[in-house]
């Protein structure tokens, strides 16, 4: 009987050790900036304008909605919860706007949490999406040629285009 109790004791200790190892590996895999994402509320919805230079392509990743407006001046506005807006990354490089959601633990949060990027652009040549998110054109976009690529993505797409050639 005493041997059985010792086995239970050591079994419980192993379960505790494995649990602590699992928790510590979960916490250490988070980037320093996003260490507490899993327990942080999204906060009040806020909008933030970001610097924009001319671009003709958009590449976007997970859990971000895109709204496109016709504009002669390029613009980028991000709307999200105040605690999470810094995790929505917008980078411009060589005429391409890259949009990423670096917030972690999105599976913990409500599906009502939305991250939206509104862009103003004169002529858009292509959109590539690599995750979840809806794409909406608020105005008709004109271009000679337009390409839309969807790589393992889901969401709705409502494009208003006036172009000679399109690749969807």
Segments and roles (model prediction):
Residues 48, 56-68, 116-168:
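Extended, compositionally simple hydrophobic/Ser/Thr-rich segments
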Residues 96-102:
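Short carbohydrate-recognition loop motifs
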Residues 9, 13-17, 30-83, 102-120, ...:
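Short acidic/polar N-terminal linker immediately downstream of export determinants
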Residues 1-8:
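Extracellular low-complexity Ser/Thr/Asn/Gly-rich intrinsically disordered segments
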Residues 17-23:
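Sec-dependent N-terminal signal peptides
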């Amino acid at each position: 009987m005493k041997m059985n109790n010792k086995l239970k004791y050591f079994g419980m200790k192993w379960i505790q050790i494995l649990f602590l190892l699992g928790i510590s590996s979960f916490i250490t895999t988070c980037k320093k900036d996003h260490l507490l994402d899993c327990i942080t509320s999204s906060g009040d919805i806020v909008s933030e304008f970001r610097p924009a230079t001319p671009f003709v392509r958009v590449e976007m990743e997970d859990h971000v909605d895109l709204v496109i407006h016709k504009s002669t001046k390029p613009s980028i506005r991000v709307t999200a919860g105040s605690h999470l807006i810094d995790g929505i990354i917008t980078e411009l490089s060589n005429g391409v706007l890259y949009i990423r959601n670096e917030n972690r633990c999105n599976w913990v949060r409500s599906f009502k949490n939305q991250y939206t990027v509104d862009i103003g652009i004169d002529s858009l040549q292509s959109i590539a999406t690599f995750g979840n998110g809806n794409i909406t054109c608020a105005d008709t976009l004109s271009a000679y040629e337009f390409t839309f690529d969807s790589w393992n993505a889901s969401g709705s797409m409502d494009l208003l285009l006036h172009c000679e050639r399109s690749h969807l």
